[in-house]
């Protein structure tokens, strides 16, 4: 029995639908033994789910901040480059540190033999971004 989105003629449309519907990692050939089809059971599924939400939530905060910096500092000689650094930190931060922390979270879940529902991945990924924002704000506040 072939699962929807696992290949064939409509495979790419089913794969895209599966990724966009919070079923984060496409299951090709039903290689996992999850009792629930919506839960994330394997390490790559959990890691990718948490990492993706950390990246998206980081961009959600850094893109408006970068655009605001670009708009307000557009006439400054060197200040206009601050917006580029804000945007880069919104991408580079989750890619470097987010990969490691998401792998640690997924490793703990996997070692405990626990499944992760997509809402937990959303909470843990956005929680990482929230912690980064709090630490960044407190660092700036300490310099004033």
Swiss-Prot record:
The keyword Phosphoprotein does not apply. It is found in: Endoplasmic reticulum membrane; Nucleus envelope. Residues 1-50, 107-116 are lumenal. It comes from the Eukaryota. Its main location: endoplasmic reticulum. The chain crosses the membrane at residues 51-71, 86-106, 117-137. It is a multi-pass membrane protein. This is Transmembrane protein 170A. It comes from Homo sapiens.
């Amino acid at each position: 029995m072939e699962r929807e989105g696992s290949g064939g003629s409509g495979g790419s449309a089913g794969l895209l639908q599966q990724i966009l519907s919070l079923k984060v990692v496409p299951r090709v050939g039903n290689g996992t033994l999850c009792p629930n089809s919506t839960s994330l059971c394997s390490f790559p599924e959990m890691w990718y789910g948490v990492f993706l939400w950390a990246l998206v939530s980081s961009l959600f905060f850094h893109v408006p901040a970068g655009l605001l910096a670009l708009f307000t500092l557009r006439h400054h000689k060197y200040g206009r480059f601050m917006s580029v650094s804000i945007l880069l930190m919104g991408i580079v931060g989750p890619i470097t540190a987010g990969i490691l922390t998401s792998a640690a979270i997924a490793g703990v879940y996997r070692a405990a033999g626990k499944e992760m529902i997509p809402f937990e991945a959303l909470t843990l990924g956005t929680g990482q971004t929230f912690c980064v924002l709090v630490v960044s704000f407190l660092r700036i506040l300490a310099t004033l």
